[in-house]
Amino acid sequence: MPTIQQLIRSERSKVQKKTKSPALKQCPQRRGVCTRVYTTTPKKPNSALRKVARVRLTSGFEVTAYIPGIGHNLQEHSVVLIRGGRVKDLPGVRYHIVRGTLDATGVKDRKQGRSKYGTKREKAKK
C-alpha cells in the first residue's frame, strides 16, 4: 500500500481494458473483402478441416475469420461482414463471418437456430 507522499508524487493509474477484437475499432461489425479462403486444422485434442477466410477490413486490418455452418459460397474478392467472437480451437481466429449478409449466403436446409446462420423460414407445406 502506498504512503500519502507516494500518492502525492504520482496518482493511481487507471487499469486499461484490452479489447478482444481490436480490428473492429469499437464497432459491432465491419465490412471486408476476402483475400484468401482456405481450410485449417484445429488444436490438439480436436481433428477437422475448419473453413476460414483472410479478410481485409475497411478499418485497414487484415484478419482471419471463421466461416460458420455447413457449406459456403465464399471465394476471393467476396465482400463479407465480420463480427467479433473467437474460435477456441483455432489459434489466431478472433472473428466470425456473418452468414446471410452481403456476399455470404445463409446455410441451406437449416431448420433450427436459423437466425445465427442467415437462413429464411421455410414456407409451410399444405
UniProtKB/Swiss-Prot annotation:
Region (Disordered): 1-28, 104-126
Disulfide partners: none
Residues carrying 3-methylthioaspartic acid: D89
Pfam families: Ribosom_S12_S23 (PF00164)
Keyword Zinc-finger in annotation: no
Molecular function terms from GO: rRNA binding; structural constituent of ribosome; tRNA binding
Subunit structure: Part of the 30S ribosomal subunit. Contacts proteins S8 and S17. May interact with IF1 in the 30S initiation complex.
Function: With S4 and S5 plays an important role in translational accuracy. Interacts with and stabilizes bases of the 16S rRNA that are involved in tRNA selection in the A site and with the mRNA backbone. Located at the interface of the 30S and 50S subunits, it traverses the body of the 30S subunit contacting proteins on the other side and probably holding the rRNA structure together. The combined cluster of proteins S8, S12 and S17 appears to hold together the shoulder and platform of the 30S subunit.
Name of the protein in its database record: Small ribosomal subunit protein uS12
Source species of the chain: Synechocystis sp. (strain ATCC 27184 / PCC 6803 / Kazusa)
Lineage, top ranks: Bacteria, Bacillati, Cyanobacteriota, Cyanophyceae, Synechococcales
